[in-house]
Regions:
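Alpha-helical cap/lid subdomain in secreted, periplasmic
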Residues: 3-9, 124-248, 259
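Short, structured coil/loop segments at alpha-helix boundaries
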Residues: 35, 69-74, 92, 155, ...
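Mobile, glycine- and charge-enriched loop segments
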Residues: 87-121, 221-265
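Conserved SGNH/GDSL esterase-like catalytic core that processes O-acyl groups on lipids
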Residues: 75-159, 184
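Serine/threonine-rich low-complexity intrinsically disordered regions
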Residues: 1-2, 36-39, 66, 96, ...
Length: 265
């Protein structure tokens, strides 16, 4: 019985070796006669190639090429400490304390410049912004202007140049312009600013709910803090990680330096 198994094994081994040799030849010669390659050899070869191709495709998927492409598109937030400048009208009284808490929590330095009753015209005809940019060297700027221009007639014509001047002074510094917290319909200040700034640089506050102070105009401190939170949440979705502003545990803070300017007569 053992001899029978050994003979059968030798026969199978010889046959396999024979077919292997045949598979490497385009033609076969037996006793000087040239024969075509057997179909079975071609089919076996095709099957082997197909199987190898499928295996290579699976390996390619496992390399994580698709995952690498997704990683390239992910937003990477700049975690370096920044100098932040926020300037504008009296709305900063509510916005600055909450922004200061964010700045402190994330290792940034905040400079706040409040110019009471100021407008785009006041800032656009002054050199103050250029002076503060030169002095504080901000890496990021927040603008809060427009509340004192809610009802200016023909604002698109009369204030356009001033908005453009402010943006020119800001230059290449990343910024967000926070629109006024409308308590009534405006005559076009929001549209004017929106028209002049690139997409993702203007936060439209109009339409939000605000709890108002006794003057019925300014948001309460608590409501202004939520307003600032809304701005920063919006930034996370619309800006490409220009500055880290993770939410602080403290409700408010104090700017590293605050400058107040009185209304222009």
């Amino acid at each position: 019985m053992k001899k029978t198994y050994i003979s059968l094994w030798l026969l199978l081994t010889t046959t396999f070796a024979f077919f292997t040799v045949l598979s490497s030849q385009d033609t076969i010669k037996i006793a000087g006669i040239e024969l075509a390659k057997p179909d079975i050899i071609e089919e076996l070869t095709k099957a082997t190639v197909a199987e190898t191709t499928e295996t290579e495709e699976i390996k390619t998927e496992d390399t994580g090429i698709d995952n690498a492409m997704i990683t390239e598109n992910e937003v990477v937030t700049d975690t370096l400490p920044k100098n932040i400048l926020i300037f504008g009208d009296s709305m900063l009284e509510g916005l600055s304390p909450r922004l200061a808490a964010y700045a402190k929590h994330n290792g940034h330095t905040l400079y706040s410049v409040i110019w009471y009753s100021s407008t785009s015209k006041v800032w656009g005809t002054s050199t103050k912004l250029e002076e503060y940019i030169s002095k504080f060297k901000p890496d990021f700027i927040f603008v809060s202007l427009g509340a004192n221009e809610m009802f200016v007639k023909d604002i698109a014509k009369t204030r356009d140049e001033y908005v453009k001047t402010i943006l020119s002074q800001i230059g290449d510094i990343p910024y967000i312009w926070i629109g006024p917290p409308n308590w009534k319909d405006d005559t076009g200040i929001n549209e004017l600013v929106k028209k002049n700034v690139p997409q993702g640089r203007f936060f439209l506050s109009k339409g939000m709910h605000f709890d108002r102070a006794s003057d019925k105009v300014h948001p309460t401190r608590a409501s202004a803090a939520l307003w600032m939170d809304s701005v920063i949440n919006w930034m996370a979705k619309n800006r490409n990680g220009e500055i880290r502003l993770t939410r602080p545990s403290k409700a408010s803070g104090k700017a590293d330096k605050t400058i107040t300017l009185q209304p222009v007569n």
